[in-house]
């Protein structure tokens, strides 16, 4: 899910040529969910093989990995590990939303509303262990390296960029910045137009490059303050303070200096503030000295 910090970022539209020769750490779960959500039939059903097994994730993976490789861009997929207990609330809420979307999908099919059916179907996507294993097998066949993180894949990828193993993290989630990724790429190869649901309106989608240092400079805050700001808004690990969005949160963090003083001014309380900070500053990762990343010839 992630947190929406777009209004606070400095976004530079880029094209594939600017990424040629670069090594990108791909937020694997993030990208696979994109494929499972978007690669569907008109009625919302995912692609399946003759045995009824979902293949949307593999279709998307083969297409995108092959295309980016042909453009001289090296990918390293980083997979999430065991979620932290603080994320349980979010995961439970997602599960309930998917159940609701499943019911609404079925209802839309009954009345013949295919546009609504497809929209609701996209919200039911589930990434199974079998799909993850299949993805890793395909990556091995393609000669594309992958890393299994102990916990958050974005945190592992961010560290690999900081340590010079990779050049940027490719993800849709602005949480990547909270984990300290120096550079992130959004909308990787998604340039084009996208139709807004239930509207006869199309929006442009461009690849975006976001540099953490420029984000901090623009807002005149530190990395620790960015994390405190996110906690006030609400993250994957906490609900945040009602009525606090990016702009209001930024203002109060700059006025108060940190989350403790901001909460005091707001007369609000977040009990596990230090634990939440540690989720971004000290997340469990593998040392890059123990991570092997090598691009090989396809099998």
Where are these regions (language model features)?
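Structured partner-binding subdomains within large eukaryotic complex subunits
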Residues: 176-178, 182-210
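Glycine-enriched alpha-helix->loop->beta-strand junction motifs that scaffold or abut catalytic
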Residues: 165-167
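Non-catalytic nucleic-acid-binding/docking modules located in mid-to-C-terminal regions
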Residues: 7-20, 24, 35, 74, ...
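Charged, glycine/proline-rich intrinsically disordered loops and linkers
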Residues: 104-118, 196-214
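Hydrophobic/aromatic ligand-binding patch that stacks against planar heteroaromatic rings
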Residues: 67, 160, 176, 229, ...
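Noncatalytic, basic helical substrate-engagement surface that gates or grips nucleic-acid strands
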Residues: 2-10, 14, 18-162, 182-184, ...
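Short amphipathic alpha-helical segments embedded in low-complexity Lys/Glu-rich regions
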Residues: 82-83, 152-156, 177-179, 247, ...
């Amino acid at each position: 899910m992630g947190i929406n910090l777009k209004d606070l970022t400095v976004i530079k539209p880029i094209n594939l040529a600017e990424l040629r020769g670069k090594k990108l750490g791909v937020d694997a779960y993030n990208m696979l969910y994109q494929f499972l959500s978007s690669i569907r039939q008109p009625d919302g059903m995912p692609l399946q093989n003759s045995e009824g097994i979902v293949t949307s994730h593999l279709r998307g993976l083969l297409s995108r990995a092959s295309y980016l490789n042909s453009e001289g861009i090296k990918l390293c997929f980083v997979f999430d590990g065991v979620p932290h207990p603080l994320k349980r609330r979010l995961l439970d809420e997602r599960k309930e939303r998917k159940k609701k979307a499943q019911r609404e999908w079925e209802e839309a099919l009954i009345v013949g509303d295919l546009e609504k059916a497809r929209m609701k179907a996209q919200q039911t996507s589930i990434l199974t262990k079998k799909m993850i294993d299949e993805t890793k097998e395909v990556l091995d066949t393609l000669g594309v390296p992958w890393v299994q993180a102990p916990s958050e894949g974005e945190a592992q990828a961010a560290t690999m960029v900081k340590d010079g193993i990779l050049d940027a993290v490719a993800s849709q989630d602005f949480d990547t910045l909270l984990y300290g990724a120096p550079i992130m790429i959004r909308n990787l190869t998604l340039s084009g137009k996208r139709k807004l649901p239930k509207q006869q309106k199309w929006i442009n989608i461009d690849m975006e490059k976001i540099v953490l240092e420029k984000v901090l400079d623009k807002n005149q805050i530190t990395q620790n303050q960015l994390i405190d700001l996110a906690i006030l808004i609400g993250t994957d690990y906490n609900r945040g303070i009602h009525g606090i969005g990016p702009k209001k949160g930024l203002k109060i963090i700059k006025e108060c200096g940190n989350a403790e003083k901001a909460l005091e001014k707001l007369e609000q309380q977040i009990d596990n503030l230090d634990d939440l900070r540690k989720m971004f500053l000290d997340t469990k990762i593998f040392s890059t000295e123990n991570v092997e990343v090598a691009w090989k010839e396809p099998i």
